[in-house]
């Protein structure tokens, strides 16, 4: 298994995808993103749209720790595929 990244994706593409996921999770948990972070999400709107459908569907009331754990499980499953 190649832990460096997904087949067919450059390290830069993987970085962008992971950063988008983290920013979306932070936003979903109620964090205020900086202007630079919001601009990053606007710049990579296509990646944002694909990642939104992959985010765990958990209530914000569930608590940040539970949401982060669900995100971690999702990341692990993505790497196995």
UniProtKB/Swiss-Prot annotation:
GO molecular function, one term: transcription regulator inhibitor activity
Subcellular location: Cytoplasm; Nucleus
Coiled coil feature spans: none
Parts of the chain that traverse the membrane: none
Domain of life of the source: Eukaryota
Main location: cytoplasm
Keyword tags: Cytoplasm, Nucleus, Phosphoprotein, Wnt signaling pathway
One GO CC term on file: nucleus
Positions bearing Phosphoserine: 59
InterPro entries documented for this protein: ICAT_dom, ICAT_sf
Keyword flag Phosphoprotein: yes
GO biological process: anterior/posterior pattern specification; branching involved in ureteric bud morphogenesis; negative regulation of canonical Wnt signaling pathway; negative regulation of mesenchymal cell proliferation; negative regulation of protein-containing complex assembly; negative regulation of smooth muscle cell proliferation; negative regulation of transcription initiation by RNA polymerase II; negative regulation of Wnt signaling pathway
Record's subunit section: Binds CTNNB1.
Protein family according to the UniProt entry: Belongs to the CTNNBIP1 family.
Functional description taken from the UniProt entry: Prevents the interaction between CTNNB1 and TCF family members, and acts as a negative regulator of the Wnt signaling pathway.
Name of the protein described by the UniProt record: Beta-catenin-interacting protein 1
Gene name per UniProt: CTNNBIP1
């Amino acid at each position: 298994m190649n832990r460096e990244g997904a087949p067919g994706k450059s390290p830069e593409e993987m970085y962008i995808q992971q950063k988008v996921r983290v920013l979306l999770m932070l936003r979903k948990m109620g964090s205020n993103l900086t202007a630079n972070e919001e601009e990053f999400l606007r710049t990579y709107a296509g990646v944002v749209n694909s990642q939104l459908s992959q985010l765990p569907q958990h209530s914000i009331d569930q608590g940040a720790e539970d949401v982060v754990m669900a995100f971690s499980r999702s990341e692990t499953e993505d790497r196995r595929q």
